[in-house]
Amino acid sequence: MESVIRSSAKICPFMHSATGSMQSVKALKNANLPAIAQQCPFMGKAMEQRRGYASSASGASAAAAATATASTSASNSNSSVEASASADVVDHATKEASFDYQGLFDSDLAKKRMDKSYRFFNNINRLAKEFPMAHRKLEDDKVTVWCSNDYLALSKNQEVIEVMKKTLDKYGAGAGGTRNIAGHNKHALQLEAELATLHKKEGALVFSSCFVANDAVISLLGQKIKDLVIFSDELNHASMIVGIKHASTKKHIFKHNNLDQLEELLAMYPKSTPKLIAFESVYSMSGSVADIDKICDLAEKYGALTFLDEVHAVGLYGPHGAGVAEHCNFDAHRKAGIASPEFRTVMDRVDMITGTLGKSFGTVGGYVAGSLQLIDWVRSYAPGFIFTTTLPPAVMAGAAEAIRYQRSHLDLRQDQQRHTTYVKDGLADLGIPVMPNPSHIVPVLVGNPHLAKQASDILMDKHRIYVQAINFPTVARGTERLRITPTPGHTNDLSDILMDALEDVWSTLQLPRVRDWEAQGGLLGVGDPNHVPQPNLWTKDQLTLTNNDLHPNVKQPIIEQLEVSSGIRY
């Protein structure tokens, strides 16, 4: 030890110049080396930093940073102490085990298998010329699809397909870049003009999906509007929830469709405080519907913006398929066609509407529609729009054609509603529990994740019917269900086959029927003596109308090509 101290005194500037320090070190010669090094103003500082980094998650890399600090601090010395510290760091990096990443993945997956929320994907290849049929892995293994969101079967519409083929042949497979770099084209402009016209807004902006649209718009609002408070329905889609998280602002979650609670929350803030109410028109897993008009009343009373997701409503409601907001003033919009009625409608009152091209419109993509300033603002600031490659030209052309086609084909919406009613009435006669709602969704309550999966498997393997089980986290635990979505192509004959199959499944698995839920006090409106049923959104009079009852301007509309997404020229 004496020789080490003498050698160190020749090398270390601190020990060489400070007699007192030399004596301190000699007194500690029987202590361990870290204790001695701590006395040095150079190594002591380096070791303090190393201890701080070692306590963090970055472990080895942080220790290396501490070594770098020590090296810088003692740059004038070629000391063996520096070499010792470096060796200590290397030893730390090589001897400690790495984090068990694969173990984490395995553990999380095991949890999902244990609670029956693990997702199994079925190989379903929908056949354009045999809708609603699909084949599985083998082409002769065919099933009837009863859970697709292709609500109007427009993905197989020949007019849509022909437009896509011609566009593909002329313009190729991809857009070539973002809207800012080579990806801005006439197809985007035409599609956005169609969407703005559909919702009777000043502009629209297309995204790669409505998940991205919801996330991008909501998060941008929260990040750019100082002190914004967001009020969100508890059953809002995951895309809206993610957007609210990314908004990094204050939020309140109100009980589903509970407008009394929403008003209580809004009243907590001065009218001058910026606010956003985020909600959906049709909630896809329950079929429940928001009271858009009353929510707009609250928004105007308390100074809030309204953000309406019409993903599961566009194409299905309103005389022209613009959604529930249009349906609220059905006759006025029908008589006006693509023009605006002479009074301020519910759709006019909503500040921003988002929707999808991937459900009723049969293609893929999402969008937001709103005022000219809002659309230009989102175009200019939203990373989810700015840094995303544009949708392929053929997709945008097909989506625009689908919007045009369904706008003048009221019968598509009517057939979908009639087929939905036929299935709901038939299941009610069998005592099979359908969660009551006024929309096109047929949620059949099971209430158990394992049994819901079994029911889906029996339908597929025995009856050649595909209905996906819906489990947590898509729905709350204990409310697992089968979600059935009739289309214009699901005839009454096919519906009869479905209902016979469900009767067999319910009998085989001894699943609870309506009377069983009644005995338990009811759940989600099933067997609940206090449940007040809502009338269907579509009235009997609306279902008797024909395509000829629509305004002529919807059939050969002159739609002005908007330039909002090109940049507004003041």
Curated annotation (Swiss-Prot):
Which cofactors? pyridoxal 5'-phosphate
Record's keyword terms, sorted = Acyltransferase, Heme biosynthesis, Mitochondrion, Pyridoxal phosphate, Transferase, Transit peptide
Lineage top rank: taxon: Eukaryota
Which PROSITE patterns does the entry link to? Answer: AA_TRANSFER_CLASS_2 (PS00599)
List the Pfam families hit by this protein, alphabetically: Aminotran_1_2
Please, one GO biological process term?
protoporphyrinogen IX biosynthetic process
Where it sits in the cell: the answer is: Mitochondrion matrix
Q: Which GO terms describe its molecular function?
A: 5-aminolevulinate synthase activity; pyridoxal phosphate binding
Q: According to its UniProt record, which reaction does this protein catalyse?
A: succinyl-CoA + glycine + H(+) = 5-aminolevulinate + CO2 + CoA
Chief location of this protein within or outside the cell: mitochondrion
Which residues does the record give as substrate binding sites?
A: 119, 232, 251, 474
Where on the chain is N6-(pyridoxal phosphate)lysine found, per UniProt? 359
Q: Where is the transit peptide?
A: 1-53
Q: Under which EC number(s) is this enzyme classified?
A: 2.3.1.37
Its Gene Ontology cellular component terms are:
mitochondrial matrix
The pathway where this protein functions is:
Porphyrin-containing compound metabolism; protoporphyrin-IX biosynthesis; 5-aminolevulinate from glycine: step 1/1
Report the active site residues. 359
Which residues does pyridoxal 5'-phosphate bind? Answer: 284, 312, 356, 388-389
Looking at its record, which EC class is this enzyme?
A: transferase
Is Transferase tagged as a keyword? yes
Sequence similarity? Belongs to the class-II pyridoxal-phosphate-dependent aminotransferase family.
Its job = Catalyzes the synthesis of 5-aminolevulinate (ALA) from succinyl-CoA and glycine, the first and rate-limiting step in heme biosynthesis.
Complexes and interactors: Homodimer.
Q: What is this protein called?
A: 5-aminolevulinate synthase, mitochondrial
